Amino acid sequence: MRFTLYATLPYQMSIQKTEVLVLNKWDFRETSIIVNFYSRDFGKMSGILKGIKTEPAKFASTLELFSHNDIVFYKKINSALHLVSQCDIKDNFNMIRQSISKVGVASLMMELIDEIMPQEDKNEEVFDLATTVLRELAITDNPDKIMTIFKIKMLAFSGFKPHFDSCVSCGARINGHSKFSFALGGLLCSGCYHKDLKSRTIFRGTVASVLHIEKNDFKVNLNLGMNPQIKKELNIILNAFLNFHLEKELKSQKVLNKLDNFAPALR
């Protein structure tokens, strides 16, 4: 007679290991914390670290925001909250933490991932992009450009991107002037301007920059030249697009807007 063992672990849990970035965390009762991670192998996920506040030596990481870690966890089958048993730091990005503007950019990256990416939906492109951008952010002198590139690439990889390669309404190829519709999520050709009377004119150079960034690798995009006019318009359109579709302004974006190098461009 053959028997099948279904639950050798409590609550039908399996032991898993993965790389993660810390999106956010909060206290749970007096001894534990709950952390939202973005992982390479499982996408966005939540884990509880029991006893970390009373016995911090149990874990080899303090799980700072946007830090890169290896974790071992018990994956629960019928719950979205998993039990983390081991956590080892890979990179705390200390160089980023020495600059308030860079901390703001890294925080916005994590908040954007948390808002856009669905729970436990694997997307290695987003994970690899985020870790690459954090490493570059640590050494760059141009964090605002890196943030712009990240937003465009992130939206493209997530499937949440605005439509820049043709008219979002009729599908026609756009060769001349166009407008951008936040409500429809993309460009409108001159024949479709009436579809959204609140759409705004957009420079051809801005459209070309977005398409270049979507098409090319992050490292290649670092060499892309953007004049102040295009950079200004990109910030306006990307931020307004996110605000419209998320129905709020991200908290980290509000902080960045208060810093001189990230002041919101005026229309």
Protein language model annotation of sequence segments:
Residues 10-267:
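Non-catalytic alpha-helical scaffolds and adjoining flexible linkers that form interface surfaces
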Residues 1-4:
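Short polybasic linear motifs
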